Structure formats: C-alpha cells, structure tokens
C-alpha cells in the first residue's frame, strides 16, 4: 500500500509541475495556439503514416506532441495519443499491442520493480512496431501496430526482409510475436550518434511502394511472445533457435533499479546493431493474451534516455551589454534538463544573429549542449501565433564607455564590475553578477571602484547580501588593495592581453601614461592597431579620472 501511495504522490507531483508551466494565455489565444500545433502534427502524421516520409526529427515530433498534450490539459481540451496513426488499418491483431508506460526516473522505476520479481531488461529499440503471425511453421501475416487493435497488412513487405525468418518450427510454428522493425546499424553508439531519425526512416521504407531491395536494410527485434513458454530463458532459447537471435543477446535478468541503470548506461555507450531510445523492463510472468489491451500493460515499463536535445519554450528575450560595449542577446527559457544540467538561458549571440534566427517569446527552440556543457540553439522548431519581439538597445556603447554609472550605462557598468571581480583580475571571491547588482542598487556606485569605500556596516545592511557573508566580502575588498599594479590596470580595461602587459614591465601609472605608441607596438601580440587602442584608452578622460582616484586611495603603482 505504501508503494502505491508513493507512486500516486509522484504522479500528483508530476501533474502539478505540468500545470505550473501552463501558458498565461486567454481562451482565444489558447485555442489558436493549440489549433495551429494540432494541424501541424496532423500533417506530420499524414506524411508519416500515409506517405512514409518525415519532415521533422523523431525527437522534435515527440516533444512537440507532448507539448500539445500539455496545452490541451492546461486549457481543458481533449488530449490526443502521441504518435496515433489514422485509424484506417483493417487487419485485426490476434493479440493487442499494449504499448509501454514510461518511467520518469530511476526512483519511479525502483518503486515499480519493488513489488515484482523475475524481471528482465531489454533495449527499447527505435523503429516501428509489428505483429508477426506464424501458422503451420510459416509466416502467415505481418501487421503494423496501427492503433493497437487493428493495423495495416504488411505481410508482403515483411516477406522481403531477409532478416525475418519465413519459416519456424516447434513451439513457434503456431505463434504470435510482437517486435520492432528497425534499421540495421553497424556499431551504432547512441551517446555519440543519437537517434538519426531511425523511426521515420523505417516507416518510410515500409510505406513506400517498390524499392524491395532497400527492405534488406531492415531487421526485427522480438520483444514479446504472448502465451509463449512460462520461463523467459525458454522463450529466449526458442526465439534464438528460430533465428531471432538478437532477443536472447540483448535480454538480461535484473533484480533492482541499480542493475537496470548499469545496463542502460552500458547500452547508451556501447556499439549496437540498432538505434535505441532507452530500455524496457518486463516481468517474465504475463497475463494471458486475451487480456492484453492498448495502454493497460502493468507487467512492463520503459525508462527512456534523456534526449540529446530538448525542445524549450522561450520565456523572454534579454539584451546584455558586455564590458567592451558589445550587445549580446540571451533567450530566457522555461527550464529543461540536458545531461543532468538545468538549462534556463541560452546565448543567441549578436543582435544581427538574433534577427536572423527570428526568435520571439513563446517560440519553441531545440537546445543541446555544446563543448564544456554550454547550451546552444540548434533550431527553431515552432513559432507562436502571436509574436512580439523586444527592441534592442541603441548601439551607443564601446570599450571606453560606462566606467562611471548612469541609467543608460547600467548593463555595461555591471559587466565591468563582474569582470574586475573575476579570478584572473582582482580575484574577489564570493561575489558575482547578482551580488554586484545588489551593492550598486543599494549604494549607488559612482564608478567601477566605488566599492573600495564600503564599510562593514554598509555591507552588512545591504539587501541580498547575507550578514554572514558581508564580513568575508569586506575582507576580500581590502585584500584587493594589495593586488599588483598590472591587475588594477586590467580591471580598468586596458586593451592588452595579460602576457603583453606583463612583458611591458610597467610598474606605475605615471610610467604607463608616458609610454608611446611605438613602445606598445613592440610588445608580443600587439600590432599597430592594438597599440593605437592603448593610446586612446590611456588618454580617455574617464580612465585618467579613475587613475587619479586610485592614487588617492594609495593603490600600489598609482601613487604620485
């Protein structure tokens, strides 16, 4: 009873999280958005099931289908079954296809496994489900999954797939098998290669007329033998003897969720002969086939892999001004998980790049992780019906603006503070963008070094700065006074690399001010253009004012 209560609680929590991200739309807007996405998915369904082609990646289709279902639940519309084909299949399945319930995570799987025994794990092969009917030792009929009760007659197509045994014997002579027609792969590593749109490719080959030779690129993985032998080992042995060898090779006994996780991770990284999108855990003991119904299989569940890319909704478009004055665009997202990382923001790049992407709040974008786990945009997969894009700030900033605070300089000013506090500059541990914003909002800095004048009492009374942290922060600010001269010059934004600055051997502000363009040009990695930038920088009125202020604070190297 406790287990079922835990499962019920987890379901309710999942539903609550789904409702928490319902769009704030009027009924009319909701109807329009749902209708547009519904029409698009119907078109994709028609292309997939009637013509055997796909205009969208499998993963994108699945996630947008889930998004549609979520919207329908949010606004009280009827839900649709994801991946539901047109109900025009005329051939009855001898045994219904049940489908498989998805587990949200390892904990949910553990709860499910706790009350069951004699459990086995198989790869969730990514292809198209099929029923194989053998009568008197011969392949009598092959039926597409359809709606689980009826499907299309695929017998002639399947007979052309050389990997499917056309004759069997023994217990299989009069049997019904269920499995997955898949695209044969040589050494497919799911972690590296992803789904390659395998499901759509298989559907395309099965739905198209002619091209019988290409069907030999397909094979079948049998995952169910309704009313077969009681023992799983006997089932696997008979299937292997008949030619369905993959089932025995890739079916393993498991006792708990830890063992499933181990196998799941192994298959995620291993070279396999097919594309997968997770694992299926099934109990060897199954009800009689006459009790099988779509959506009612309690003896098996799936634990899918986390998608390599996730569809995320854009909440807002934000503009950031860097320390050099460049404007960059960031998309704020409804959070998604990618490889155990919560992604809430993704950098779009320049204003021009954003305009080329044509991204607005409400759009659905495909996000993945690039090198070092940095989120990136792969595609815009759906654009909302109502699209209002914000106006970017005027391009009035450059590398010599916003050393002093003003309303128009807010973002670049904060960027300069974040830069000077970084490890490679003044090394102010324990303060980032949020902390600088809190300090500036409360104490209204005049310029980028005004924080040097803050007292322990002021820091302690700053909203957003914990009292326990304020003493540590004051200590960090005091330690900064002992940083070398070159670190302070870097904090002022001198347009030189650290290597070039160190090579200059400049040790005082007065010495730096008298250095010529020719002197700077001789430094490693510093050409004539960069040397002119240094001259412009040191002659800038704001820079000179900051130098004088640091001298008054008796910062090393700035004293007269």
From Swiss-Prot:
Keyword tags: DNA damage, DNA repair, DNA replication, Ligase, NAD
Signal peptide: none
Gene3D superfamilies: DNA ligase/mRNA capping enzyme (3.30.470.30), Helix hairpin bin (1.10.287.610), Nucleic acid-binding proteins (2.40.50.140)
Keyword S-adenosyl-L-methionine in record: no
PROSITE patterns assigned: DNA_LIGASE_N1, DNA_LIGASE_N2
SUPFAM superfamilies for the chain: DNA ligase/mRNA capping enzyme, catalytic domain, Nucleic acid-binding proteins, RuvA domain 2-like
A molecular function (GO) term: DNA ligase (NAD+) activity
Annotated EC: 6.5.1.2
InterPro entries with a match to the protein in the record: DNA_ligase_AS, DNA_ligase_B, DNA_ligase_CS, DNAligase_adenylation, DNAligase_N, NA-bd_OB-fold, NAD_dep_DNA_ligaseB, NAD_DNA_ligase_OB
Function: Catalyzes the formation of phosphodiester linkages between 5'-phosphoryl and 3'-hydroxyl groups in double-stranded DNA using NAD as a coenzyme and as the energy source for the reaction.
Name of this chain's protein: DNA ligase B
Source organism per UniProt: Escherichia coli O7:K1 (strain IAI39 / ExPEC)
Gene name of this polypeptide: ligB
């Amino acid at each position: 009873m406790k287990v079922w209560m835990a499962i019920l609680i987890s379901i309710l929590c999942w539903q609550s999280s789904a409702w928490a991200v319902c769009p704030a739309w009027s009924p009319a807007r909701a109807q329009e958005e749902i209708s547009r996405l519904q029409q698009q998915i119907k078109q994709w369904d028609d292309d997939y099931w009637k013509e055997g082609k796909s205009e969208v990646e499998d993963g994108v289709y699945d996630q947008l289908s889930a998004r549609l279902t979520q919207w329908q639940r949010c606004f009280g519309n009827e839900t649709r079954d994801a991946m539901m084909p047109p109900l025009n299949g005329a051939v009855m399945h001898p045994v219904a296809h049940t489908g498989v319930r998805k587990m949200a995570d390892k904990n949910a799987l553990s709860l499910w496994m706790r009350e069951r025994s004699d459990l086995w794990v198989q790869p969730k092969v990514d292809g198209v489900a099929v029923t194989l009917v053998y009568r008197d030792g011969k392949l009598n009929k092959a039926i597409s999954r359809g709606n689980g009760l009826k499907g299309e007659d695929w017998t002639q197509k399947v007979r052309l797939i050389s990997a499917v045994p056309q004759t069997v014997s023994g217990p299989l002579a009069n049997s019904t098998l269920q499995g997955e027609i898949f695209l044969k792969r040589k050494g497919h590593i799911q972690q590296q290669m992803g789904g390659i749109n395998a499901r759509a490719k298989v559907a395309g080959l099965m739905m198209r007329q002619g091209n019988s030779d290409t069907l030999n690129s397909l094979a079948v993985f049998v995952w169910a033998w309704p009313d077969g032998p009681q023992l799983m080992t006997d089932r696997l042995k008979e299937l292997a003897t008949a030619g369905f060898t993959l089932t025995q090779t890739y079916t393993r006994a498991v006792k708990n969720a830890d063992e499933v996780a181990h196998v799941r991770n192994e298959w995620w990284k291993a070279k396999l002969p097919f594309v997968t999108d997770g694992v299926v855990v099934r109990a060897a003991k199954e009800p009689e086939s006459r009790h099988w119904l779509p959506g009612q299989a309690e003896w098996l569940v799936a634990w899918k892999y986390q998608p390599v890319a996730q569809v995320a909704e854009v909440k807002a478009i934000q503009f950031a001004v860097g320390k050099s004055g460049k404007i960059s665009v960031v998309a704020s997202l409804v959070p998604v998980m990618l490889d155990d990382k919560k992604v809430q923001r993704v950098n779009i790049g320049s204003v021009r790049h954003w305009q080329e992407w044509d991204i607005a709040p409400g759009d659905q974008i495909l996000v993945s992780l690039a090198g070092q786990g940095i989120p990136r945009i792969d595609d815009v997969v759906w654009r909302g019906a109502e699209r209002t894009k914000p106006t970017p700030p005027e391009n009035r900033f450059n590398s010599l603006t916003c050393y002093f605070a003003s309303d128009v300089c807010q973002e670049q000013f904060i960027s300069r503070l974040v830069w000077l506090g970084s490890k490679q500059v003044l090394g102010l541990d324990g303060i980032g963008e949020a902390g600088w914003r809190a300090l500036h909002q409360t104490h209204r800095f005049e310029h980028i070094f005004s924080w040097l004048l803050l007292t322990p009492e002021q820091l302690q009374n700053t909203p957003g700065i914990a009292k326990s942290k304020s003493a540590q922060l004051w200590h960090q600010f005091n330690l900064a006074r002992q940083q070398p001269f070159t670190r302070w010059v870097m904090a002022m934004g001198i347009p030189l690399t650290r290597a070039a600055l160190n090579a200059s051997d400049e040790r005082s502000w007065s010495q730096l001010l008298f250095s010529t363009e020719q002197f700077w040009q001789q430094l490693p990695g510093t050409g004539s253009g960069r040397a002119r930038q240094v001259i412009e920088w040191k002659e800038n009125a704001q820079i000179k004012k900051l130098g004088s202020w640091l001298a008054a604070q008796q910062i090393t190297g700035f004293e007269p």
